[in-house]
């Protein structure tokens, strides 16, 4: 399988404009990444392809076609989650193609799993939830025992619509008001 390199973005020297950052044209960057993945898939020996979220799905799909190896995708969120239902059709198409091509799909929550199954029409047997998690530190119990006089309410998450920081602010205000 040959990659059509004529559709990728290059600079005036003919080099791929691949930055690894979010450029002005994100879809072009995804295509450039796909081209790099095709070269790697032709030259490396590997057992499995892991595509981590929609930006890497086209590269993973192409690597799968070249290598015949299974592909697992990891879904932290879908465009339904990120946009709260105002889905970008280009992003949806890439997400759907990645999910359709995947041999297995890992989601980080049951909510995301249900979205993948219902909105992207995936077989439930193909989708597994593996929650984000950390091991609690030994000293956490000691922190709970300390006598704090000040009130501490913490939000741990990106400040994006899907993380719901506005809900945190509402709940924090209620908690603070009820503990006076």
Language-model region placement:
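A conserved catalytic-core segment of Leloir-type glycosyltransferases
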Residues: 1-43
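Nucleotide-sugar donor phosphate/pyrophosphate-binding loop at the beta->alpha transition
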Residues: 29-36, 69-72, 80-97, 136
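Membrane-proximal helix-turn-helix segments that form the acceptor-binding/catalytic region
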Residues: 38-43, 65, 88-105
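Active-site proximal beta-strand in glycosyltransferases
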Residues: 48-50, 57, 61-82, 106
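A short helix->loop->beta-strand "cap" motif at the edges of active sites that frequently abuts
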Residues: 67-70, 102, 124-126
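Carbohydrate-associated surface elements
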Residues: 111, 133
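Conserved donor-binding/catalytic core segment of Leloir-type glycosyltransferases
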Residues: 146-174
């Amino acid at each position: 399988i040959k990659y059509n390199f004529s559709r990728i973005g290059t600079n005036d020297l003919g080099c791929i404009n691949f930055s690894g950052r979010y450029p002005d044209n994100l879809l072009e960057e995804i295509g450039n990444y796909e081209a790099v993945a095709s070269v790697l898939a032709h030259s490396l020996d590997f057992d499995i392809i892991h595509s981590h979220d929609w930006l890497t799905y086209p590269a993973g799909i192409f690597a799968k076609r070249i290598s015949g190896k299974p592909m697992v995708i990891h879904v932290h969120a879908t465009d339904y989650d990120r946009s709260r239902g105002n889905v970008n059709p280009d992003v949806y198409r890439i997400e759907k193609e990645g999910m359709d091509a995947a041999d297995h799909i890992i989601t980080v929550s049951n909510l995301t799993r249900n979205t993948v199954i219902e909105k992207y029409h995936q077989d439930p047997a193909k989708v597994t939830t593996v929650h984000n998690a950390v091991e609690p530190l030994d000293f956490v119990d000691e922190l709970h025992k300390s006598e704090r006089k000040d009130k501490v309410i913490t939000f741990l998450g990106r400040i994006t619509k899907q993380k719901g920081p506005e809900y945190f602010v509402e709940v924090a205000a209620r908690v603070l008001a009820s503990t006076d």
